[in-house]
Amino acid sequence: MGKQEVRTRSGERVAIVAGLRTPFARQSTEFGQVPAVDLGKMVVQEMMARTAIDPKLIEQVVFGQVVQMPEAPNIAREIVLGTGMSINTDAYSVTRACATSFQAAVNVAESIMAGSIDIGIAGGADSSSVLPIGVSKKLAASLLALSKTKTVGQKLKLLSNLSFKDLMPVPPAVAEYSTGLSMGQTAEQMAKSYAISRAEQDALAHRSHTLAAQAWTEGKIRDEVMTAFPEPYKKWLDMDNNIRMDSKLESYAKLRPAFDRQYGSVTAANSTPLTDGAAAIMLMREGKAKELGLEIMGYIRSYAFAAIGVEKDMLMGPSYATPIALDRAGITLNDLTLIDMHEAFAAQTLANLKMFASDKFAQEQLGRAQAIGEVDMSKFNVLGGSLAYGHPFAATGARMITQTLRELKRRGGGLALNTACAAGGLGAAMILEVE
């Protein structure tokens, strides 16, 4: 596979000049009444203020939301209209499940590469608290028919056909539409298929919380997380509220399995919680960033997406996308300074790490002569991961990009991998570079 050039036709690189996120909050806590669109506006507004850039210079916004709200289907355009940008700023929304803001970043990068724009914003927001609660199909059909009736008798006849069950609200589905399998069930299957023990999963979760707590304590995360003042402005949140600041390994063993009560090993403690939050990054043509006198955080070196089956191993996307991104960057796993993998579940993370190092997997599934290699854990998720920070679906990619670039900078530069699994058997990988 050939090397990928993430550059404009004149040879300029795609630079990331800013990155910011809200604190991530567990479902029904501080952001319990804040819709995703407001979280998105909040973070983009603050990022532009910190960058001190004229909002009218932003030419494109690509934003994502996984849990869609019918009243605001194009979250990107709502963000443009609600943050002081020019009304002529192009804006559209994307969704790639848990890899949504990676897709948003790539879309903006490709617009810059094509010469269509110089400056764009990418990101994502999700609320697991403010949800689109639906109605049954029978009630929906009856309500539609009701609007066309003319007499009271006709209305009563329609309503009399409804049962109590038909009137019950329908929450958003948590299972795959095509298979009926939930993410947790797939994580449980992967734990069993790849012989990943409960102890290994709990140890990874403990590691994630411990490293995230340490990162916050040492001030490494502070500047990339804004203080949020959600309506009605009576309280604020300036830190992620899912992190166990005093994580103890023995406490993880106390939880019961969540998806296979009898033989399972996936628990609430070694899985990401439902989370509310938003994150955004600002991308520019390299020359434009220098012209404006902005400090460049880093560059996108390459990216790749992959799609696999959903009946089994649905969360193995990183193992398929990462080799492609490495090839396109012209590097190997050993060339990386940092590796950051989205931790949807400890089981999924550990299964992917095993497949990174498996020659059998590489030969049989990827058609490669050998594995990309074993991950050096001293480079892996060094500030903790999604198990600790939480996972507002569409925001996680932008969180990872910002967090990784800042950590690379602290280490004097280098190359890093960001990779994530996603619903529908999707995978994303991105190589980032800091000079």
Swiss-Prot record:
Keywords, in A-Z order: Acyltransferase, Cytoplasm, Fatty acid metabolism, Lipid degradation, Lipid metabolism, Transferase
Catalytic activity of the protein: an acyl-CoA + acetyl-CoA = a 3-oxoacyl-CoA + CoA
Keyword Lipid metabolism assigned: yes
EC code(s) of this entry: 2.3.1.16
GO annotation (BP), single: fatty acid beta-oxidation
GO terms under cellular component: cytosol
InterPro entries: Ac-CoA_C-AcTrfase_FadI, Thiolase, Thiolase-like, Thiolase_C, Thiolase_CS, Thiolase_N
Positions annotated as active site in the UniProt record: 98, 391, 421
GO terms of molecular function: acetyl-CoA C-acyltransferase activity
TM annotation in the entry: none
Domain of life: Bacteria
Subcellular location: Cytoplasm
The protein's annotated pathway: Lipid metabolism; fatty acid beta-oxidation
General function of this protein: Catalyzes the final step of fatty acid oxidation in which acetyl-CoA is released and the CoA ester of a fatty acid two carbons shorter is formed.
PANTHER family (alphabetical): ACETYL-COA ACETYLTRANSFERASE, CYTOSOLIC, ACETYL-COA C-ACYLTRANSFERASE
Family membership noted in the UniProt record: Belongs to the thiolase-like superfamily. Thiolase family.
Subunit structure: Heterotetramer of two alpha chains (FadJ) and two beta chains (FadI).
Protein name: 3-ketoacyl-CoA thiolase
Upper taxonomic lineage: Bacteria, Pseudomonadati, Pseudomonadota, Gammaproteobacteria, Vibrionales
